[in-house]
Structure formats: C-alpha cells, structure tokens
Amino acid sequence: MLASIILSGWLLLAWLYFLWSRRRYYKVAWQLRGPIGWPLIGMGLQMMNPETFLQYMDGLSRQFKAPFISWMGTSCFLYINDPHSVEQILNSTHCTNKGDFYRFMSSAIGDGLFTSSSPRWHKHRRLINPAFGRQILSNFLPIFNAEAEVLLQKLELEGVQHGKRLEIYQILKKIVLEAACQTTMGKKMNFQHDGSLCIFKAYNGLTEVCVKRMLSPWLYPDLIYRRSGLFRLQQKVVGILFGFIEQLLEPIVSVVAANSNPDQQRSEMEMRGKSKAIFIEQVREHVERGQLSWQDVRDEANVTIAATFETTSTALYFTILCLAMHPCYQEKLHKELVTELPPSGDINLEQLQRLEYTEMVINEAMRLFAPVPMVLRSADQDIQLKRGDGEFLIPRGTQIGIDIYNMQRDERVWGPLSRTYNPDAHFGLDSPQRHAFAFVPFTKGLRMCIGYRYAQMLMKLLLARIFRSYRISTEARLEELLVKGNISLKLKDYPLCRVERR
C-alpha cells in the first residue's frame, strides 16, 4: 500500500514537472487559440488520415484565425497559412532547421539537404550549390531534349496509334527520373524499357510510410515504431532504394577507391573542369578533398534523386492535367509555341526563355496544386511573430507548419477565382499585385529549394515539346479531383487522358 502511494506521488510530481517545463507553450497556445487535442497524442486522431488532412487543416484555418496553435503528440505545432506570417518564418535565421518530424524521413532515406539541420545543412548546401548553377543547367538541355523525344514516342505509340487513354503521371515519372539520374549521376537507366516498377513503388511506399508516421503520434517513439508493421514496410522499401542508389554510385566509388595517388587525383580533377561539374562530379571532388564522406554522398544522392523526380513530375503532371481540363488555355499555349518555336526538333535555351505564357500555365498549376503542400520548420530560438492584433512570442522548440496548399487557394489572397485554373487572372500582366510570399511552390527565403531552376527548365521544355505537337484532353473536372496529403501532392485517383496529334 505504501509503495503504491509513493509511486503515485512520484508519478504526480513527474507529471506536474512535465506541465511546468512546457508552461511557455501553454501560454502561446492560450494567445493563439486553436483546436484542443487529447493528452499525449494531441490532434493525432483527427489528423491521422492523409486523404483528408489538407481539407481538415483548411477547415481549422477557417474556424480559427491563423496563425493558431495545435498539438501533434506532445509537440507544440504553430499553423500558418498567410503570406505575412510565412515571410517572417522563411526569412528568420532562427527557423532554418526543418521540423522535428523530418527525422522520420532522415532515418529512412538519409540526412540530405532536404532533411538535414544546421550546421550540416549550411556546409552541404555550400558544397553542392555549384552543381545547380545556371551554366551547369544549360548543359543539361541535350539530355532534356532527348528525354522529351522518348516521351513523345511513348505518347505517339500508345496514345495516338493504339488509341489508348493514358495515365500520364506514370509515364512522366519515368521520364523525369531518367533525366534526374543522367543529370545528377551521369548514368542512363532506360526506365521506359525495363521492369523498373519496383523503384517507383518503393519511392511511393517510402513517402506514405513517412507521412503515416508523422500523423500517428503513438508511433513517434522508436521503441514502439520498430515493432510496428509500418517499420517493416519501411525496411523493405528502403532496401530497394538503397540498392538503386548503390547501383548509381558504384562506378564512382570504384574509381575513387582505385585511385589513391593524390597527384593523379588532382590532375583528373583539373581535366574534368567546372563545365562538367554535375552533382556526382562535385561530390566526388569533395570526397577526394576530405570534405564529405561516402555516407554523406549516399545520403545526398538518395535525397536529391527522390526530391528532384517527385516534385518535378508532380508539378508537370498537374500542369498537363489542368490544360487537359481547360482546352481554351491549351490553345493559347499552343499559339505561343508555334510562334516562338520551330515546328519540330530540339529547343535551345534562348527559345525556352521566350516562352512566357508557358511559364504562366506552369505557375498557375503549381499555385492550385502545390507540389509540396506543407513544409515544416522548427524554432531553434524564441521568435516574435507579428500579427494584425499584436506580436506573439513563439517559444524555442515550437514546430511550425506552413500550409502552402491552402494559402495558394485562399480567396482572401487570390480573390474570387482562387480555386479555379486561370493563368491570365493570377499571373497575367493585368493581374493584381500580391504579397511576394503568396506564391511559394519551391518555398522562399533562406532555405529555398536548391533545384527550383532545374525543375522550371525541365518542365518548360517537356511541356513545350508535348503541346507543340499534341492535344491532350480528359473527362475529369477540376472540382472532382480529390487530393491526398503527402510529401508531394497526390491524387486519390488519377484520371486518364486522351492524346491526339495536331
């Protein structure tokens, strides 16, 4: 009996200490009131379904004036979806670290630029940044044009000659991943011609595993997670993806391992030159200089390939789908393409830069269907958040969710046509001036996506090559599409499209 009383007393004291240590979070939660969660799991039960997560957060933002505080597990979660607050967070030197929830991704795919924290992120960004410079990207155009030709042949054979309605997203993913492997790793994989479905299923499975864990607070402790079926699925898909990355890296690893002469290494580095410094060449040099380890290279390669192909193929697909659902804008795009481009053949950089309306239709699709619907940051120091009715202290350790998807659809920011596809109204010359952070498909500020120029160039070129020669249509309607929350935006069902030669 006495032992039970003593144990109960200790548990009560521990609970009171836990509450006292978090008093600053409770204070800001009182000021920025949001939904009240359950003890220990917070809003986990309400948010656990990825298929309704974005719609649920949109409903909360209408019920509570954002920014507001919610809870995921025991983590204090600041939700923002207005450009003014987003600007403050993305430009803050105290919010450059990704949210704590990204540790679930780094434990699965490695600690690369997308998931890492300072000072590791600063060091790796500085070392890898030259691989995504403008001059390097212009050297990728022959690869992009070659992959565009493969894409057109696929559309011609299956869509036109065989008359099949196509699930274009699956075709695009193979094209974009092929381009990513060639331009970052220097290796051609022929995804369109071999049985590579397991790679794409593994990438899709990995993102679903990470999101399910993020939305399930009871799986946050590693002790519990490692005994779950979700962890076993993670191990399976990670094994496939790590094998794929090792296949890409193996030739480079072998060359470096065999070349132990420092003078010979320096000579080879000078011969390669900066003009050919693609990602793998950059990191190879850093390994030879002792600035990166091969584990760093594996992590960065895994994350770079995954992020490049996932976000780019998603944005490109939604652009094509929006144009298929809105033939009037597709015809305006075609008019620009026949005016600015030759009737066939490759597209060069100068021609690509003249395609202003092409860029508009891409931006409008990324506004309506943000490739990465939500990004997370973590406050590593106390910060002051300004709102219309005053300033609020956001305590160190607060997790910050930036809801890009719903912000870019908000009628208070984008007007009455915010949930319609209308490139002219939102990005045309006569469109209203908007906050600089109202449109952030690649984020902005101190941790802007390193590959945004790469994605823009590849999307513009593929889109131009497709719609110069083909017309795409679908029976789907914009209001019928059901999106799912994921690392990159997904649809519950992918509509089929019909392809016709012009």
Curated annotation (Swiss-Prot):
It is found in: Endoplasmic reticulum membrane; Microsome membrane. InterPro entries: Cyt_P450, Cyt_P450_E_grp-I, Cyt_P450_sf, Cytochrome_P450_Monoox. Its EC number is 1.14.-.-. Keywords: Endoplasmic reticulum, Heme, Iron, Membrane, Metal-binding, Microsome, Monooxygenase, Oxidoreductase. It is an enzyme of class 1 (oxidoreductase). Heme binds at C449. One of its GO terms (molecular function) is oxidoreductase activity, acting on paired donors, with incorporation or reduction of molecular oxygen. Its main location: endoplasmic reticulum. Its cofactor is heme. It is a peripheral membrane protein. PANTHER family: CYTOCHROME P450 FAMILY 4 (PTHR24291), CYTOCHROME P450, FAMILY 4, SUBFAMILY B, POLYPEPTIDE 7 (PTHR24291:SF201). Belongs to the cytochrome P450 family. May be involved in the metabolism of insect hormones and in the breakdown of synthetic insecticides. This is Probable cytochrome P450 313b1. The gene is Cyp313b1.
